[in-house]
Amino acid sequence: MATDQSAFVIVGGGQAGAWVARTLRSEGYQGRVLLIGEESHWPYERPPLSKTVLLGAGDDEGALLTAEQASALNIELWLGQRVIQIDRAAKRVTCADGRSAAYDKLFLTTGSRPRELPLAAEAPPDRIHYLRTRADAARLRSALRSSRRLLVLGGGWIGLEVAASASKLGVQVTVLEAAPRVCARSVASHVSTYLQGLHASHGVEIRLAAAVTALSAVGRGLAAALDDGSVFAADHVLIGIGVLPNVQLAESCGLAVDNGVVVDASGRTSDPDIYAAGDATNHFSRFAGKHVRLESWANAQGQAIVAAQAALGKAVAYDEVPWVWSDQFDVNFQIAGFPDQATGVLTRGEPSAGSGCWLMLDAAGAVVGAVAVNAPRELRGVRKAMQSGDPIDLSAWSRLAAA
């Protein structure tokens, strides 16, 4: 039972952490709320980093919790602090500088970190970029202002968003993707083909099945060598080859971890006094029919709200259709469900022409996901039907070949 004398501690100052803190207060919790974040910035949303922030948006873009809001809500923040130990028996966390805090309930919202490319160690470090934090974005933005050519290693969502932003700034961009198509882990081939065409129409070169074998300094820039003998030179390289969940703390204190911190539908870990939410968690999704680890803004926020409510004693469960979005050039993409599970595709409108929706079906003909192009209303309808289990009238959709 939460009391005015209890303490709820949140480790991680991103989307999930900020929403845990805000939800605790909106639900009426009066005890101590302490949020500990590794970054010195106040909590902020990450989606703008690859888009509006690179294009010049101010430092307050995507702010989740300002100093004024934290003061008004009586939320205590330790910023620029890294938690190095969780003592479950004593119910206490310890930071790298020696500070510690006791907790009644603990929330792990530690997020994820970019997967590093070992080959990058051979290249000039001032020319290599990853994108996860506001500091990363500021450094990349500065580099793009003085660059003519950018290499993007990885044709996933982050890589393509950065490619689009850099292209808008007048930078010549080449994307090197190891797979046979872009975003192959998350969408069907029809969507990949559209994405590739969109970027080509704006002058972005995409090389598929491109295996990078070396990165080396060339003059004041660097070059990437491929296994087919081709070489691509650039001023800077952005590496976007996925992320890894930050589960080190959870592992070190003995929590169940399996491709993320294992949580139940309410965000509880294997310790009933510790909850987790966001990119670092693994939960069962009825829409996938299995345990999944989701990397999205919406999942981080939704899980955080449920975890905070559950810690206060509410009988709640996180059960939402996965949803992500991406802005590239003048196109807004919205994705619901698990389109990568599709074996068949239906369309409404003309998504390949820039406005419409692909509806993804599995082998049994069930809807498993959707991808909308400049059609948010269409996507909302599909999400609502998937969430409720209501049937979707497929008579208004046109059938395409297998996904």
List the model feature ranges, each with a label:
Residues 12-15, 38, 132-133, 153-158:
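Glycine-rich Rossmann-fold phosphate-binding loop(s) that bind the pyrophosphate
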Residues 140, 391-403:
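Cysteine/selenocysteine-centered motifs that mediate thiol-based redox chemistry or coordinate metal-sulfur cofactors
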Residues 2-7, 26, 280-376:
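Mid-to-C-terminal Rossmann-like scaffold of FAD/NAD(P)H-dependent oxidoreductases
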Residues 1-9, 65-151, 225-227, 236-240, ...:
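FAD-binding core/adjacent interface of flavoenzyme oxidoreductases
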Residues 124-147, 220-225, 231-306:
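FAD-site-proximal beta/loop scaffold in flavoenzymes
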Residues 50, 149, 158-214, 296-299, ...:
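Rossmann-like dinucleotide-binding cores of NAD(P)H-dependent redox enzymes
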Residues 79-90, 208-220:
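A conserved short coil-to-beta-strand element within the FAD-binding core of flavoproteins
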Residues 2-76, 165-186, 381:
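Beta1-alpha1 glycine-rich phosphate/pyrophosphate-binding loop at the start
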